[in-house]
Design a protein with these regions (language model features):
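Residues forming the flavin
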Residues: 1-413, 417-482
Length: 482
């Protein structure tokens, strides 16, 4: 049994590993990426050259990464994929694919720092090649030095649009339009928070400087509402709409581009925590997060959580939570260490900034009005808006889970990571009700955490007779009615 096991090697996981090791606890650090740093400090392979200019504060990241590598108390599993997790009698069992071999890890002390991924909203044409998430565009730049396209529209909502636009410009691309759906004045709702988080202002100005040099001006209250493909089947242009406070379309213009990077903030990656049984809640932005106490401990003793899975808040909050989680986990296994008042004070300051983010970049329900009946909602299973409406109006679905069973929406390769949140909103809107917490939780929790080779699951996953009947019924409904 390992002493302290940490999942995720981004800002939170690296900080937790160093804090726990410094307190005297042996640490196993597991990450799915081949290199440490997470998405925020994504590093290229050695043969792809230096991508330093794609980062704002890479020095801090390299400092943490090298500190983790230098600690003899820390063992690292890079490129490791956790596909199953269970909790029983105080022991957490992780099934991990590492170097082509399945390993079973048992631990009573776990820190989950699994981060987040881009939140997407469906719209007509969003499945055309060339329509990407901002995170996807940035991953290509940071990890491989690859520019996704020469003429790029960056759109959606949230501060993450700034580094992506700046990164495209630095790589030699043209940002045709930079669009923020919300109004610029919304940050004025939290002036004191801005003043106490000067480092975040410096980061924003760092990106704005690059954007301004390219003579690019952000346009507020505008969004991409449709995409169009050319004769080769790839993206040729997008429709950009001026939208109102509730995201309803006012007027539309068409812009030529070959890449559209569109994102609406982030969704916390809570699958692993959900599989272990950690208590979850719905945040103010409608996303599911894991509940944590003042020591970053979840509802299950011995399982600690830090970073974006406790609420989207950025790298600095993730590091602050990671330090507290690492110290708390070390104390849990008997190390004589305490969380300092300064640690909690730093976390509180960064948490206030995170709360201001939610207020400044809301995603209004009016986005649903951008869709038509043929708009694809689930790209994996090619389920349209009309398919969902048929499941509700004709087949009697009364919640998103039933609609999923009737249409296979969210049952493809991504297991609902891309469409799950939108499906919950769309089904609720069609039923004229508010999305329930149960529907929100159902959209993010899954028994098999990530896709795996069938050979690995042989003999491990068993279906009851009722499971098989339900799947057969769902299959027949799909064949005959959709």
């Amino acid at each position: 049994m390992h002493n302290v096991v940490i999942v995720g090697a981004g800002p939170a996981g690296l900080s937790a590993a160093i804090a726990a090791a410094a307190a005297g606890a042996p640490v196993l650090l597991i990450d799915s990426n081949p290199r440490l740093g997470g998405q925020y400090w994504r590093l290229p392979a050695d043969n792809f050259g230096d991508q330093h200019d794609q980062h704002f504060d890479l020095d801090t990241g390299l400092l943490l990464i090298n500190a983790v590598k230098d600690r003899k108390e820390i063992e690292i599993y890079s490129g490791a994929q956790i596909w199953s997790a269970t909790h029983k009698d105080g022991i957490n069992t992780l099934r991990v694919l590492h170097n082509g071999v399945e390993k079973i890890i048992n631990t009573g002390n776990l820190i989950l720092c699994t981060g987040a991924y881009d939140r997407t909203l469906p719209f007509p044409g969003w499945d055309i090649p060339g329509v990407m998430t901002p995170g996807g565009v940035q991953s290509l730049l940071k990890g491989h030095g690859v520019l996704a396209g020469k003429k790029v529209v960056v759109a959606g909502s949230g501060p993450f649009l700034l580094p992506v636009a700046a990164g495209v410009i630095k790589a030699g691309g043209e940002v045709v339009d930079l669009l923020e759906a919300n109004k610029s004045y919304r940050w004025l709702l939290s002036p004191l928070v801005l003043l106490e988080n000067v480092s975040k202002l410096k980061e924003a100005f760092y990106y704005i400087k690059t954007i301004s040099k390219a003579r690019l001006r952000a346009r507020f209250g505008q969004a991409v509402v449709a995409a169009h493909k050319g004769s080769d089947g790839s993206l040729e242009s997008v429709d950009i709409a001026t939208i109102g406070r509730k995201f309803k379309i006012k007027k539309i213009r068409n812009v030529k581009c070959n890449v559209a990077a569109i994102g609406w903030g982030f969704t916390a990656e809570t699958s692993l925590a959900g599989a272990l049984g950690c208590k979850q809640s719905v945040a103010k932005d409608g996303g599911v997060v894991v509940v944590a106490d003042q020591d970053q401990q979840s509802s299950i003793p011995g399982i600690f959580v830090a970073g974006e899975i406790t609420g989207i808040g950025g790298s600095e909050l993730s590091m602050a939570e990671g330090v507290i989680a690492g110290i708390s986990a070390a104390k849990f296994v008997g190390c004589k260490v305490e969380v300092l008042k300064a640690h909690r004070k730093r976390r509180a300051k960064k948490q206030r900034f995170a709360n201001a983010l939610i207020k400044s970049y809301p995603v209004k329900a009016g986005w649903i009005s951008w869709l038509n009946g043929q708009t694809v909602v689930c790209r994996c299973e090619e389920v349209s808006v009309d398919n969902l409406k048929y499941a509700i109006d004709e087949l009697g679905a009364t919640d998103s889970r039933t609609a999923k069973l009737l249409t296979r929406c969210g049952m493809g390769l991504c297991q609902g990571r891309v469409c799950g949140r939108s499906v919950v909103d769309l089904v609720a809107a069609e039923l004229h009700i508010s999305p329930s917490d149960t529907d929100r939780f159902s959209a993010v929790n899954r028994p098999v955490i990530s896709p795996i080779p069938l050979g690995v699951s042989k003999g491990r996953i068993r279906f009851s007779h009722d499971n098989i009947k339900a799947m057969a019924w769902s299959f027949n409904c799909n064949r005959t009615s959709i």
